[in-house]
Amino acid sequence: MISNNIKSWRKFSLLGLSLALMNTSCIDYMDNVNPNEVTEEMMGVDNLKTGAFFSQMWRRVVIIKDGEMMDSDYQIAQQLSHDQYAGYIAATLGSTAHNGQYIFQESWVNATFDYAFTGIMAPWQNIHKIATEQGLEEVDALATVVKVAGMHRIADTFGPIPYVNYGASNQYDPLDKIYEKFFEELGSAIEILGNYVSGNSSAKLMSDYDYIYGGSVAQWVKFANTLRLRLAMRVAYANPQLAQEQAELSVNSPYGLIETKADRAELNHGLLSYHHPLQEIAYNFNAGDCRPCASIVAYMDGLNDPRISKYFTLTGDGGYNGVRIGISTSNMANYQGTKVSNLNMDASTTPVVWMTAAESFFLRAEGALRGWNMGGDAKTFYEQGVRVSFEENEAGSADNYLADDTSTPKAYEDQVGSDNYTFSTEVTPAWDEADDFEGKLERIITQKWIALYPDGPEGWSEYRRTGYPELIPVVVNGSNGTIDTELQVRRLPYTRDEKINNAEGVASGIAALGGADNGGTKLWWDKRDR
């Protein structure tokens, strides 16, 4: 149920919108207008009409159960792929063939692609049309920021997708061109929203429909700036000059970055009644369709990380233990007892977080390591990132943790089977100025990865971009040789429905991809050999 004293007639409008944007298997990029879409007369004033489309977008960057979508939609679109590949969440569903084994389930891959286009791109297109007609450039700018927040996750999943000329062409754009468009859009949006809030730091926009910041434009500009910094770092190996340019634009912007828990981007429980889908999947889907991944549990346990109790529950023997991805089981009961930890999530308080405050510090730490002008040094930003993550998770002081130069990731001991694993990494929490570039980068990304949990799309992207942290490989690799077990999965293949309904577009995507349409082909920004 949507809170914030929204009148019943608005609920009917949102219901009409949900029907209008119902997920379909065929996406028409040329004219994405649903004949069942709610009419202007039904929607009433422009503000209500635009707000309803915003409401749709904010609930689709990360899928939540809202009457139209279900927790199972999040499960198939994200948890069974990104969250696993990031080393965060392992699937324990009774199945002998699934995404975790690199045996891609077509309906799940379809969901990842389709939900983004029907839930983000379609409503954005409507907002863009209304805002352009009404001369509301700040509304258009806000919608564009949300669009980029959602769609970069999809581009980072598949590679080339329809984006640059969305609405006018069904062709797939090369990923480098999509990123250029991201930066163009974010730069324009930051300028427009910055001007809107200039001289009035409390300026509001779409406050009745904003489940993230309650309409605070100042906070949205910080988010947009930090998002630009995130995407700049993503292309650091593919286009170093562009990466540095965009990163320095963000850091030097007068509108600031996300630096505190109060400014982090999350679905606010005070503005929207919802629960984190992982909580439902972990506790109520067949008594638990997922558990913590062995990788992150082994890291946090071995590093004596106090955040581990905030992330996961204790096992029956008083310790912490996870599950490797890529397992093959038809007996889920092995993973539903107390031998394995569970996710420490509360249905009423655990938020869905789009961007943590800690991330901005780790991004600047890496930028400083690369010699960019980040306004500080790598060590200081690194330690600030860890401290802010501790604050965000209410894990106490980080002083002892940051001084620990001996603790390393713990060897994984399978409590159910015999799929044990010993790490080769010797990374510790304490900064070591004597480390070379790679040693410092591994430390930054390892702590960033821990702080990002459970944001699977971002964790997986950073692993592919940098090769860090060392993640435990899959137990079963069913890719028939298309995915290297040690390098791990690099992307999702294009969807069955798109190959049927938009064969020409998919062909353009494969051509731009520069490799086979399988999970082993690297994306444009994925340049490292590790």
Where are these regions (language model features)?
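Short acidic (Asp/Glu) and glycine-rich catalytic loops that position anionic groups and cofactors
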Residues: V33-P35, V340-N342, N420-T425
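Bacterial Sec-dependent N-terminal signal peptides
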Residues: M1-P35
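C-terminal functional modules
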Residues: F390, E394-R530
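Structured, solvent-exposed acidic/aromatic patches
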Residues: G44-L48, A90-A398, E433-L441, Q447
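Residue-level detector of alpha-helical secondary structure
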Residues: S25, Q56-R60, P123-N126, L249
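Membrane-proximal, proline-rich intrinsically disordered regions
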Residues: I2, C26-Q84, P469, S479-R530
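Intrinsically disordered or highly flexible coil/loop and linker segments, enriched in small
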Residues: S18, M22, D66-G67, A395, ...
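Beta-strand acidic-aromatic groove motif in beta-rich domains, primarily in extracellular
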Residues: D66-A77, P160, Q244, G456-S461
